[in-house]
């Protein structure tokens, strides 16, 4: 009996403008998967849209239809076998012709297709495969015209996008270009087999004492005939077989077995334990011959969202294996506009950065796509929790019957595809669609529980989020929590801070509050918040070609910042807080300081609130990454170069973090006067699961001289509350009559004799401070073939020492505050002897 054979159709393709009938219209495609812009660039028909104003010169592609074709030779077909043509992803309106005959019409980018082409390929020899990709941009506009009664309320992009099941950011977003891709964006192949394992998944039941786990493995088998098959299941850990069992495949194509695992090794998010992965495999056997084999890795763990009434309202936090997890992390957008260009290695580097930054959760945002398997594999292996949105974003989606059916198929396919990943702990119905409902005044009666009524309102999309999607998750991944939207909380106003999750945009957007009070603006789980910053100069040098354009307000820089009102917002936060500059390099740095400070103030306070009966369950900043070289809210740019905010967040998310802050008086109000006194607070946050003892030292250091202006405070043998907050000082007082000199509050904490964390509180705003002549010393103290260690010291307090980010180089820490009497070490990996030292910059330099 022949085993399943795969024949990828990745080479030999050509493509053309569908309307171009000339003989020389066809152009070669280097490799499939691809999208049309990649292929046009490869043929020198399109400039790089990521550079300068080139995006505008590529817009013509958005309004074209494209045809791809190839020929292939029919593979040998053993007796009793069939040939299938499999598409893992077609973007988006695709008509597939085999030897001139239409065999598939697809209108959903997020679906895979498998077609039995045995009869169509009866003839030996070469066969033609042609795919027409109709213009999604124009089709969307036509679909919108056909339903004039629907309220097409939306944020970002053309509202017609709501009619098409395609990545919504392709229509342009407030951080990305308008690039309407089309093409074979995931693998296409031929498969020859008599039978195959169509799906393999597990149900994990973990005993409450974690001493035993029952693993039930399920296989779904597809066969081209009625032959009987056996399914041989194997369970293993780190390559060592733990169990094996063989069963007959039932007439309906199903097979299942159960394994008992004693003293299982659990899957944990990083920082809490090992991300242990078991492997289950199933071999499909006929007459002792293996015809197909599939393996999947999975984790033994429990995960839940805890929502309980408390003094703050109703909690919203994650609990894994019985341990409450403060979910500090980021939101994720697609890593490129050309999705096929994102390799497994590139995905892994992004997730490695998450771990390096001590971030424990990543939110896959609903305007992008259900990511490649390699993305989730990396999260599984490295212990990063995934908050997974369904692909609906910022709009009131129509609910035509054919569209609802497509959405149901899409959600079933993707939940089934991803359900074995232990990293995925929540499925969420949409991004900000309930905010669109509020903004547009659409009907939403939470007390009306009749789904058929929802379809009759001007907010019919509720039917998707509160009926279709929860039903799919319940059927195919019942152990995974489902949340109707982000933000959403029990049908209340999406800005309600007492319930559910919230997107807090009153820093930057909205009322543009001071970032120093960010922590007072949060809710039970802050799943979006952000502050823009320019990327590093090396990234700007990539997309700004002309030196004459390298000034802060240049047209090309404005063009690469898609956020509405970005200039006045950046200007406001700069002018309120810092001494501004007109040269681009300093301007870039100053925006990065503001972003780093904003993230620090938010995260630091919200993590502290975790210890107050889980007042804040987590914080996911907007956003981790970029889809092109740009100016945005990302804390790591398109080229994986971290901005200073990345390091600021990492320090606050240290397993033990110490915090100090004084009361900051608003200096921008009428008749603002210097305060006579300020209160200050001191605390320790810990994610450790056991109590430890520590020593905490607080010093008061003059910014002008570096000397201590008052007696230091030392707390010895402090019992640090596990997985919570230890408040040491809640009513400290600074009397500026007694200590008028501007000074910082510098705190350190030692555990078991090791210095584990620092924090420095500065007078606000920085623009009032003289930060010249700091006496900074950056000394190389050790060097090996691939690593350097720097020793940092200063005679006076230094604010935000930022190192140059260089390709292939990883820095242990940056955006560092340095105070006298506290030397710090920074490790730099990827630096070789003889390499030029990393440049650096600090405030007031």
Swiss-Prot record:
The keyword Cytoplasm does not apply. The active site is at residue 432. It comes from Aspergillus clavatus (strain ATCC 1007 / CBS 513.65 / DSM 816 / NCTC 3887 / NRRL 1 / QM 1276 / 107). GO terms for biological process: glycoprotein catabolic process; polysaccharide catabolic process. Its EC number is 3.2.1.25. Glycans are attached at residues 717, 723. PANTHER family: BETA-MANNOSIDASE. Belongs to the glycosyl hydrolase 2 family. Beta-mannosidase B subfamily. Pfam families: Glyco_hydro_2 (PF00703), Glyco_hydro_2_N2 (PF22666), Mannosidase_ig (PF17786). Pathway: Glycan metabolism; N-glycan degradation. InterPro entries: Beta-gal/glucu_dom_sf, Beta-mannosidase-like_N2, Beta-mannosidase_GH2, Galactose-bd-like_sf, Glyco_hydro_2_Ig-like, Glycoside_hydrolase_SF, Ig-like_fold, Mannosidase_ig. It catalyses: Hydrolysis of terminal, non-reducing beta-D-mannose residues in beta-D-mannosides. Exoglycosidase that cleaves the single beta-linked mannose residue from the non-reducing end of beta-mannosidic oligosaccharides of various complexity and length. Prefers mannobiose over mannotriose and has no activity against polymeric mannan. Is also severely restricted by galactosyl substitutions at the +1 subsite. GO terms for molecular function: beta-mannosidase activity. It comes from the Eukaryota. In contrast to clade A beta-mannosidases, which are likely secreted, clade B proteins appear to be intracellular. This is Beta-mannosidase B. SUPFAM superfamilies: (Trans)glycosidases, beta-Galactosidase/glucuronidase domain, Galactose-binding domain-like. Keywords: Carbohydrate metabolism, Glycoprotein, Glycosidase, Hydrolase, Polysaccharide degradation. The keyword Oxidoreductase does not apply.
